[in-house]
């Protein structure tokens, strides 16, 4: 069974833990208890393949930013979560994305942009803004509500599909060359 290491990142209070717990335990946690770092595992079937999701729910607070590099190194894919009622959390997404790319030393890393709290009446980040940013980044955009469970499975499952696509692309690049494999022998002088 394939295991996928997913990391949920975003500013404090955007609903990272609520999304993760909704996926894992099917219930909404409405009290806010800032996370330092929590890990969850769940077996699911995505596109006919049984797989194990290893989800790291991270701290959004700035005082825990020193821990970020470590979890970014180990993650295979990232949910970039912002709250639709917080323009600041949306602005922070670019910083998270750049940090992930720097730590992973890669231009393309599997990511999904997630606009959470879509059940709220007032939005400070419009759908079009988020779609435009996702398009610029070349990543999918999913709207979610941890409260109503809208889009929760879709967000995590889309990230798994992005990881699979990334692995397929890297596999093809590695096999593409038509040049014969030449080995050079070292000579000690």
UniProtKB/Swiss-Prot annotation:
Keywords, sorted A to Z: Cell membrane, GTP-binding, Hydrolase, Lipoprotein, Membrane, Methylation, Nucleotide-binding, Prenylation
GO MF annotations in UniProt: G protein activity; GTP binding; protein serine/threonine kinase activator activity
Q: Where is the lipid attached (S-geranylgeranyl cysteine)?
A: 186
UniProt short sequence motif Effector region, positions renumbered to this chain = 32-40
Q: Which organism is it from?
A: Drosophila virilis
Q: Where in the cell is it found?
A: Cell membrane
The activity regulation comment is: Alternates between an inactive form bound to GDP and an active form bound to GTP. Activated by a guanine nucleotide-exchange factor (GEF) and inactivated by a GTPase-activating protein (GAP).
Please list the reactions this protein catalyses.
Answer: GTP + H2O = GDP + phosphate + H(+)
The record's EC number reads 3.6.5.2
Cellular component per GO, a single term: membrane
Q: Just give the chief location class.
A: membrane
Function, as annotated: Ras proteins bind GDP/GTP and possess intrinsic GTPase activity. Plays a role in eye development by regulating cell growth, survival of postmitotic ommatidial cells and differentiation of photoreceptor cells. During larval development, mediates Ptth/tor signaling leading to the production of ecdysone, a hormone required for the initiation of metamorphosis.
One Gene Ontology BP term is: chorion-containing eggshell pattern formation
Q: What is the recorded membrane topology of this protein?
A: Lipid-anchor
Where Cysteine methyl ester occurs along the chain? 186
Domain of life the protein comes from: Eukaryota
Q: Where does GTP bind?
A: 10-17, 57-61, 116-119
Q: Which InterPro entries does this entry report, sorted A to Z?
A: P-loop_NTPase, Small_GTP-bd, Small_GTPase, Small_GTPase_Ras-type
Give the family per the record.
Belongs to the small GTPase superfamily. Ras family.
Q: Which residues form the propeptide?
A: 187-189
What PROSITE patterns would the database entry show?
RAS (PS51421)
The UniProt gene name for this protein comes to: Ras85D
Please give the name of this protein: Ras-like protein 1
């Amino acid at each position: 069974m394939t295991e996928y290491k997913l990391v949920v990142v975003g500013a404090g209070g955007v609903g990272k833990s609520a999304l993760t717990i909704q996926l894992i335990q099917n219930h909404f946690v409405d009290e806010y208890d800032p996370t330092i770092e929590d890990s969850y595992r769940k077996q699911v079937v995505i596109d006919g393949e049984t797989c194990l999701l290893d989800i790291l729910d991270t701290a959004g607070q700035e005082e825990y930013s020193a821990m970020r590099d470590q979890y970014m190194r180990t993650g295979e894919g990232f949910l970039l979560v912002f709250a639709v009622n917080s323009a600041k959390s949306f602005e922070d997404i670019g910083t998270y994305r750049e940090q992930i790319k720097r730590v992973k030393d890669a231009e393309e890393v599997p990511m999904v942009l997630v606009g959470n709290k879509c059940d709220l009446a007032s939005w400070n980040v419009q759908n079009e803004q988020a779609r435009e940013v996702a398009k610029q980044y070349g990543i999918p955009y999913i709207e979610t509500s941890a409260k109503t469970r809208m889009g929760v499975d879709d967000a995590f499952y889309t990230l798994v599909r992005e990881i699979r696509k990334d692995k397929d692309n890297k596999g093809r690049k590695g096999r593409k060359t038509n040049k014969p494999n030449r080995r050079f022998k070292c000579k000690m002088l």
